[in-house]
């Protein structure tokens, strides 16, 4: 009988903070600038340059720590993590090892077995490295230091997760908390949220941890789930074959759905940490912590409760809408403009979610304006267009953020209410479908629906459904 194994997973989640300037200098953190245009002597490691801590980085780190139930180190320090790599111009990274800003927190996730608490070992602040570019020249790599010195927090979990599903639930919970705080946009595709997966397997029932590996290059939740499954199987196969699992860092190739070894996995002592002599310790007062708490924005749980109370949404609807901060922001903006909360929720939950699924997009990637969705709701509500045409218009809003009023006029999509025209078209449909007329008179209600559908198709969806039903019933007798 084959052995049963348990997967043990911990995560190191790196989050780029939404500050306008870097952690230790005044250079811009804007994404996508020309290479090496957001740099200065500090973030490129020039001799004699001195770092100055960005206060906003501290405030974001504290806000995240408080939101995930952490204890705050009211006396924290920065340390130097020493290593040599081309994208690290100082040959060390300023981080926190001995006294990180936050420790001993947790978040709760939903699992099939119920609520599960995932421990957070610590949160520390650090600076990001530069970026190596390998595809510009054949015989060398280039370095872009725009990212060097961009502020990060690293959220280190306890090894409390046991499956890919639990990992994704944890990451989604973290992402929502951080987005609602405004601390980061957490866009995996742009690298503002990155997760390294530490994974080991052991025999079910054992309390002894196996040898862990670290998985890198994971830029989507789907890639993370696939990497976990692939690494779990790889380690089990090694154990079954009597081979050792090597403690190493591995790079995931999502196209090949496999990983390869990058280097042996380092321990803290390999980096020869020591206190940074250029940065004084930071003392965090009770007053400062209280001020952060008092300014903390509405998080998802409170927003859900408010939507049910203020907008009379069901718990299910409120849960779906608040599942993305961007979608919740659009919902509130649309509702503020048109005053129709349930209609706004319906368009977002049904049509927007359908298109997101079709295009394999995250809600954060939606670019249409709240004003245009509010205009569409008004056009449908006042009968200018029917809902069928409204869906067509929404697809254009979703894809191109078009002005729906202008689009409806240009394409001639207004509802046809002219009784004579409707009667003429319906008479033609009735004459062309004698079998359906006979079926209707023999009690087959589906035949009526067929005739309505033929009428709407003939009029390209622009007919008033109520008028079509009324006139058709008159003609059928």
How does the language model describe each region?
Residues 190-203, 308-330, 341-358, 371-373, ...:
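Core structural elements
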Residues 18, 198, 202, 233, ...:
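Amphipathic alpha-helical core segments of compact helical bundles
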Residues 268-270, 304, 358:
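Active-site lining segments that contact anionic ligands and/or coordinate catalytic metals
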Residues 445-477:
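Short, amphipathic C-terminal "tail helix"
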Residues 1-298, 315, 336-340, 350:
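Basic, nucleic-acid-interacting segments
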Residues 301-308:
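Extended, structured, electrostatic nucleic-acid-contact surfaces
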Residues 363-374, 378, 387-457:
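Strongly charged, low-complexity linkers/loops
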